[in-house]
A protein has these predicted regions:
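Conserved AMP-binding A3 loop
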Residues: 21-26, 155-179
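AMP-binding/adenylate-forming catalytic core of the ANL superfamily
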Residues: 79, 96-98, 246, 363, ...
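Conserved AMP-binding/adenylate-forming
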Residues: 20, 35-79, 416
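Conserved pre-ATP/AMP-binding loop-to-beta segment of ANL
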Residues: 9-10, 127, 139-159, 166, ...
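Gly/Ser/Thr-rich phosphate-binding loop
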Residues: 243-248, 259-327, 340, 350
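Conserved AMP-binding/adenylation subdomain of ANL enzymes
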Residues: 178-196, 206-245, 259
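Conserved structural elements of the adenylate-forming
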Residues: 27-36, 151, 170-192, 200, ...
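Structural core segment of the AMP-binding/adenylate-forming
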Residues: 40-41, 70-134, 457-459
Length: 511
């Protein structure tokens, strides 16, 4: 932030659809003011500041609180209010900053929030909330905060639900974030200060942080910040603003290609389209490469806990297209420099090339551990290696392929959904006796959430009515797209439900 403000003070750092622009110099001054406000409220290095908001410039300014050693905790605004409260009570922040949507989300449960929590709003404040902009206007803007960040300390805590649905906060250090930012900017996205980047991924997600925000800071790019994805708007802005670099998930790419404006939109300025969150069906990737003929394509592999790890770059995509070698497109690429990866068996012993096992990683960008959860940390960290829980293999050329997810996680529309969490919500319904949740292939979502349920004796439940009740307990993207009623669930001899058998049974079902 300091370097960009000194080198390009008048250059646009951020712009928005409503015509707002913010230069690097002004942005740095607003960040200073935000830090001074927090210090005046009594926050000191190590204090947590939770942020619950859709994408907007003020969210980026809040990330700048790391400048004074504060720890930023970005929250998913799509989750249910009870889930937000659970995370807030776990990380015990000193301040919560929200937009109007976030305020509406937590207001009904305000009595359950941690005691002493400073309540701040980006928008009009209700009773008990303070408007952050008013506090910032009287704060110093040309002075760096008196407290400074230590590079080895925690900068962010990013929450990811565990397989049991228990929230786990990955503690990411300043050094780790900087390592990921520089690696992504130079080796994955090929950014330079002339790039115009469209940021549409949510900033509470590492996809928005690692593939938009932090790499653009590292390279000095200008960012068009969108609050939501709308295919027509994205096509228009790609064309009119001459966007050069954009990161989308496969579901978004499919929506762009299917939009009526796609056929005549001028997308010639786009030189890099990065996709992640899930693999892309080969037929969809072929369509995208035909529609963006002069654009380089890249995809990466990583996780909240690991940082960015691999890239399948533009040259790999061109080689796969020109040689009709579609199998390469199923790869997540090769590791970056200073990233170590290996495939191991259940005992942690390295496996030979081609063998399938768990992928483990070692890198400067990985998390320090899970916040306030030593047991969960010990389960995934051992001798410097992080156990990803992903099953994969490596080929002779060093390319990695993700084969399956050991924990049965579902990636739908770029969002991670854990079956046990959805099952717990289903089990809470009075009509449900047994339930199992699994992923099924879907042409739009790539993978959709599906559930097979056994009703309680005497229950006559309509699946749509069950879904309506479920939406009061879970975020919409976690709710099953399809519910199958069955008399019994397939189980192994010890009574464990066989999700693989359910996937095989229902794959291709029209319902």
């Amino acid at each position: 932030m300091r370097r960009n403000a000194a080198q390009w003070p008048e250059k646009t750092a951020f712009s928005t659809l409503d015509g707002r622009t913010l230069g690097f110099g002004t942005f740095d001054r607003r960040v200073n003011q935000c830090n001074h406000v927090m210090q005046a409220l009594g926050l000191r290095p190590g204090a947590r500041v939770a942020v619950l908001s859709r994408n907007r410039v003020e969210v980026v300014q809040a990330f700048g609180l790391t400048k004074s050693g504060l720890v930023v905790v970005p929250l998913n605004w799509r989750i249910a209010p009870a889930e937000v409260v659970k995370i807030l009570r776990h990380c015990a922040p000193d301040a919560l900053i929200v937009d109007a949507h976030g305020q509406k989300l937590v207001e009904p449960l305000r009595g359950q929030l941690p005691e002493g929590l400073q309540l701040l709003s980006f928008d009009a404040a209700q009773s008990g909330w303070r408007l952050l902009a008013d506090l910032m206007d009287s704060a110093p803007e040309d002075e760096d905060p008196s407290w400074q960040a230590a590079t080895q300390e925690i900068a962010c805590i990013v929450y990811t639900s565990g397989t049991t649905g228990t929230p786990k906060g990955a503690a990411l250090t300043h050094d780790g974030l900087l390592d990921n930012a520089r690696t992504a900017a130079a080796d994955m996205l090929g950014l330079d200060p002339t790039d115009q980047v469209m940021a549409v991924m949510p900033l509470f997600h590492v996809g928005g942080m690692w593939y938009h925000l932090f790499p653009c800071f590292a390279a000095g790019c200008s960012i068009l910040l969108l609050s939501d994805f709308d295919a027509g708007v994205v096509l228009r802005e790609l064309q009119d603003r001459r966007i050069t670099n954009v990161h989308l998930v496969p579901t978004m790419i499919a929506a762009l290609l299917d939009h009526p404006d796609a056929a005549h939109a001028d997308l010639g300025a786009v030189r890099m389209l990065f996709y992640a969150a899930s693999s892309m069906p080969p037929q969809l990737l072929r369509r995208a490469m035909e529609r963006f003929p002069s654009c380089g394509f890249a995809q990466g592999y990583g996780a909240t806990e690991t940082g960015v790890l691999t890239v399948l770059g533009p040259e790999d995509h061109r080689r796969a297209r020109d040689s009709a070698n579609e199998s390469l497109l199923a790869s997540c690429g090769r590791p970056f420099s200073q990233r170590e990866m290996r495939v191991v068996d259940d005992e942690g012993r390295p496996l030979p090339i081609g063998a399938v096992g768990e992928i483990q990683v070692r890198s400067a960008g990985r998390m320090r551990g899970y916040w306030q959860d030593a047991q969960a940390t010990d389960r995934v960290l051992h001798d410097g290696w992080l156990r990803t829980g992903d099953l994969g293999r490596r080929d002779d050329d060093g390319y990695y392929y993700i084969v399956d997810r050991r924990n049965d996680m579902i990636v739908t529309g770029g969002e991670n959904v854990y079956p046990n969490e959805v099952e717990a919500a289903l089990f809470a319904d009075p009509d449900v006796q047994e339930a199992s949740v699994f992923g099924l292939p879907d042409p739009h979502w790539v993978e959709k959430v599906a559930a097979a349920i056994v009703l309680r004796p005497g229950a006559a439940c309509d699946p749509q009515a069950l879904l309506q009740r479920l939406r009061t307990r879970l975020a919409p993207y976690k709710c099953p797209k399809t519910i199958f009623l069955t008399d019994a669930l397939p189980k192994n001899p010890v009574g464990k439900v066989l999700r693989k058998a359910l996937r095989e049974r229902y794959e291709g079902e029209p319902r």
